[in-house]
């Protein structure tokens, strides 16, 4: 099983959201992913867009590398609760996120683990820093769509 720490960030002054993701493999390898976007729908939900993109990217990475399972470690509860149905997805993007993750769960086992934010958890803090750093990168824009993550 792959373990992925995910986090999101938002900067109002530049109208961008971002994600950071640290992926840990059973062999002890570590991979880092990050990206940012400025899609108007994503900007409306601020850092939540990044939180969701982090989870989606972690699942995509695990599938591409043929792992049978991924555990998403997150500090924002919606990452799990929209997927499991504990929370009702009320916006177009949270609905798309939930549908995307539920569909992905038919191909790979996805589990979730809540971690406390900003409490010194090394990998969670690193995911947070990756997201913050990605805010300033404008070479790619990341958006959430029903079937895939769109890089424009």
Residue spans of the language-model regions?
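RNase H-like nuclease fold core
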Residues: 1-49, 60-61
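Loop-to-helix element that buttresses phosphate recognition and phosphoryl-transfer chemistry
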Residues: 50-54
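RNase H catalytic domain
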Residues: 9-15, 56-126, 130, 135, ...
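A cross-taxonomic marker for long C-terminal extensions/tails that follow the last structured domain
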Residues: 150-152
């Amino acid at each position: 099983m792959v373990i992925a720490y995910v986090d999101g960030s938002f900067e109002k002054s530049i109208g961008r959201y971002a994600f950071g993701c640290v992926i840990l493999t059973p062999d002890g390898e570590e991979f880092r992913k990050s990206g940012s976007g400025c899609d108007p729908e994503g900007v409306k939900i601020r850092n939540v867009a990044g939180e969701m993109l982090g989870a989606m990217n972690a699942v995509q990475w695990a599938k591409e590398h043929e792992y049978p399972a991924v555990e998403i470690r997150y500090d924002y509860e919606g990452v799990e609760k929209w997927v499991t149905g504990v929370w009702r997805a009320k916006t177009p993007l949270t609905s798309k996120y939930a549908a995307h993750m539920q569909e992905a769960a038919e191909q790979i086992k996805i589990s979730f683990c809540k971690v406390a934010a900003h409490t010194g958890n090394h990998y969670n803090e690193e995911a947070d820093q990756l997201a913050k750093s990605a805010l300033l990168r404008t070479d790619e824009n990341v958006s959430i769509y029903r079937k895939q993550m769109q890089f424009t």
